[in-house]
Amino acid sequence: MSTLLIALIALIVLLIIILVVFLYYKKQQPPKKVCKVDKDCGSREHCVRGTCSSLSCLDAVKMDKRDVKMDSKISSCKFTPNFYHFTDTAAEQEFGKTWHSIKITPSPGESHTSQEICERYCLWGTDDCTGWEYFGDEKNGTCNIYNNPYLALKYTKDHVLYLPRNHKYA
């Protein structure tokens, strides 16, 4: 009987030690910093879904865009202030169920690139833009402005695709 009592006391002491160590460890982890833009974060960190993170761009896209389906050939992207920027990437047809195409030919005196014009179309006071892609050269091209939140990205040469960061459809 006394060995059973000693074993029970030892088990209780062990559980208390594990609980104290667990609570101490949780207390030592710094809280995640809340953010709205990258400038709110430290160097080498980006604002992803409202918290500062050191995730790679592709991992950030997978976290920010919940159900993203990405072609395995897509190996990188980069952060821009309002978008995730992909090169050699286009939207699968089901992503563009609801989209409109805009032919871009900047005037000679225009100081903005065709891609900057596409970005402005997407940011023009609407939350409905879930992404845009540009294909063409520096002078002439086409913007596809998407307003449907289905995400499926494919590898395609000479396309540039942008997905809004920290977006309501994420």
From Swiss-Prot:
* Induction details: Expressed in the late phase of the viral replicative cycle.
Q: Mind telling me which residue stretches traverse the membrane in this protein? A: 4-24
What domain of life? Viruses
* Location in or out of the cell: Virion membrane; Host cell membrane
UniProt topological domain (Intravirion) ranges = 1-3
Which membrane topology describes this protein? Single-pass membrane protein
- The residues on the Virion surface side of the membrane are 25-170
What's in the GO CC field? host cell plasma membrane; membrane; virion membrane
Decide whether keyword Transmembrane is in the record. Answer: yes
Its keywords, alphabetically, are: Early protein, Host cell membrane, Host membrane, Membrane, Transmembrane, Transmembrane helix, Virion
Protein family membership: Belongs to the asfivirus inner membrane protein p22 family.
Q: What protein is this chain from?
A: Inner membrane protein p22
Q: What organism does the record attribute this protein to? A: African swine fever virus (isolate Tick/Malawi/Lil 20-1/1983) (ASFV)
